[in-house]
Amino acid sequence: MEYNPKAIEKKWQEHWKNKRTHEPLSDTSLPKKYILSMFPYPSGRIHMGHVRNYCIGDAIARHFRKQNFNVLHPIGWDAFGMPAENAAIKHKSHPKKWTYDNISNMREELDSLGLSFSNEREFATCDPIYSKWEQKFFIDMWNRGLIYRKKGFLNWCPNDQTVLANEQVIEGRCWRCDTEVVQKEMFQYYVKITDYAEELLGSLDTLEGRWPSQVLTMQRNWIGRSEGLSFAFKLTSSSKERIGGSFDSFEVFTTRPDTLYGVTYCALAPEHPLVRELMRQGKLPQESLEALAKMQNIPAKERAMIPKEGVALGLEAIHPLTGEAIPLWAANFVLTDYGSGAVMAVPAHDERDFEFAKKYQLPQKQVILSGAAPSLDEAAYTESGTLINSGIFDGLESESAKEKIIRYFEEHSLGRGVINYRLRDWGISRQRYWGTPIPLIHCPSCGIVPEDFSNLPITLPEDVIIDGEGNPLEKHPAWKECRCPKCGGKATRETDTMDTFVESSWYFLRYTTPKEEWETHALNEAMQRYWMGVDEYIGGIEHAILHLLYARFFTKVLRDLGYTETNEPFTHLLTQGMVLKDGAKMSKSKGNVVDPDELIERFGADTARLFVLFAAPPTRELEWNDSAVEGAYRFIKRLCDKTQFVQKVSSLPQIETATLSKTEKLARKKVHETLLKAQEVYSRKNAYAFNTLIASCMEALNALSDQENPAIFTEGYFILLSVLEPIIPHVAWELSQEYFGLANFKPLTPDTQALKSDSLTIAITVNGKKRGEIEMAPGSSNEAMLEAAKNEVSKWLEGMSIIKEIVVPDKLVNLVVKP
């Protein structure tokens, strides 16, 4: 058959759509597979990373459909977010139009790959019906006390009068106008993800062996559970007087109470309330005030990369055990949103504290015996050891001292042992237009009130001006002004919108609900119970922390709110590698982008699919290779050229093996080994190593071509098309329909007789070194194996005495000799 990809691919894409071939069934008695690739942002064009991600998921989905599983394999669009607003400013287009136009373009591109998505479950997160239920979840969480409002510091561009995301701050300046960014305190909405910290951490254990260990480690570190001591440093009388009595003490947390006697100063975040009060009162020199203001305007993520700096505050605190006066400093390495925003500094036993103390000539005090460690003049000793200079705790080992010091603090009401987490509550409000409106009303009489469910969804006004200056919703009085749902009085809407990570934290649950129920149900209880969890979730490892953690958290919240019974949303996680060209990630700036549309136009979708699945294992980086693409095309063409040897049949041919030649048996063996490998690949035994499966298919086609028995060729072709269907579906369906009436797209079982060999290769070693090989019939006796082996390696036995003979049946002969 002549290979014409354009005609074949268009034909079968229309067939699958018209026949609803890829839609999930409502029959919950069937075994199910939920295969999901992370949904894309509708940027306008797909890239090769998309192609790889979706071809991996599609191959898995197609395989399990062929195995008679009920498969849910949906697609949707993560459609809210900042790029749409940026495009509106740049191109003078509305974010809504820009977004939906991009969705239309990208869906056409994805369709051209022959991806077997469910068309009837597709949605965009900017669809009002999706926002309706997200707003309902927000209200439920607000009423449950899981969402609260407080002031927080945000990146603020004074020129554009707008909040900037961290990624919009480039070296401390606004990405758009190059104005220096400042930190501005504003009200924000936070979700209490910390209420679930222990469960989020503990249930990672249930994902061992099913998620990549690297992702599990990253989440454990991000949650950051630590046990330690929480206590207060009280200010000295003179310090309290200096600050006008507005502060009496400040809290700290330490995981090293065994070093407490080594505290020589305390460091506070530049944004700490005590520091801000000092600044407000003007109790610091102008130089110090300017230095603090500069520190406060550096985003937290950039502080870790700059030299450590501090400002002496002219205040002192009382050491709770020694009574000594400890100086207070503001330091740029202390973050206000981690712990209490204040730390006890032990320069002798903490590297960061040591570096800061060296810079500002602050004292250090050794309280842990360092043994053979370097001099404390050169570096801090950070390991455990025996306590010294620690009063009544001298001589204790660190672990014992930690317990006793915590107990001492608790017995004397000085502090308490606590479990702390690095994880912070999730700030979900954004001062932007293109996002899900937060469903809260500000009433002068009633305070902050959730909107009535009957008024949901709160939709965005379309008559807005997006110019990059301020929040368009804040400047839209007709939309902003409303009635309080509680008292009916005049009120105003909340103008913040939700972080787009909220949308992607539950979309996988939404897919389980049939489209006809989207208006009336957030989730269909029976359907989500049947489909969840996602059997295979596919996406980049860059989502290991935020998206995957938020999705796990949101699932647990919805469980507690009664929407689902699922504890963990993703049963298995596959993190695919990046697509590289010339050793670097593809990007327009590097000029190394490969356009998927051009690739499909030239070679066809099946070639693109075959290449991305063959060039590297899914979890590894894929290096682009033009000649390998051409090789993939040649293989498909060769597959089509071989149809002259195929007989038309409606079932798997029965082969009489007794009369087969060695070449014919070898061809059958290779084909059935390929079928066996397919079973292993899709069972996750080797992380979906499609590359090895495709290589086996190529070898099998070669073996079939080396023999002339049409029955053998037909059987092999019948099986190979079935194995290749998830990978190159268009040509597989075309050939299968022509010769087998699609009868081979069903579960096939390897023939155990075909897998057997007439002979086995036996390795021969002499004194442990391989010296030769022999061919033996399976099940040959030890005596026969020894005789053949000795003949094969006779030259290595000359002048030697055999002192030991070791035979491993069907595998090995080892001869131990000496002169």
From Swiss-Prot:
Catalytic activity: tRNA(Leu) + L-leucine + ATP = L-leucyl-tRNA(Leu) + AMP + diphosphate
GO biological process, any: leucyl-tRNA aminoacylation
Keyword Aminoacyl-tRNA synthetase on entry: yes
Locations listed in the record: Cytoplasm
Keyword Ligase carried by entry: yes
Sequence motif: 'KMSKS' region, positions: 585-589
SUPFAM superfamilies: Anticodon-binding domain of a subclass of class I aminoacyl-tRNA synthetases, Nucleotidylyl transferase, ValRS/IleRS/LeuRS editing domain
One GO MF term: ATP binding
InterPro entries, sorted: aa-tRNA-synth_I_CS, Leu-tRNA-ligase, Leu_tRNA-synth_edit, Methionyl/Leucyl_tRNA_Synth, Rossmann-like_a/b/a_fold, tRNAsynth_Ia_anticodon-bd, Val/Leu/Ile-tRNA-synth_edit
PANTHER family listed in its UniProt record: LEUCINE--TRNA LIGASE, MITOCHONDRIAL, LEUCYL-TRNA SYNTHETASE
Protein name in UniProt: Leucine--tRNA ligase
Organism of this sequence: Wolinella succinogenes (strain ATCC 29543 / DSM 1740 / CCUG 13145 / JCM 31913 / LMG 7466 / NCTC 11488 / FDC 602W)
Lineage: Bacteria, Pseudomonadati, Campylobacterota, Epsilonproteobacteria, Campylobacterales
Protein's gene: leuS
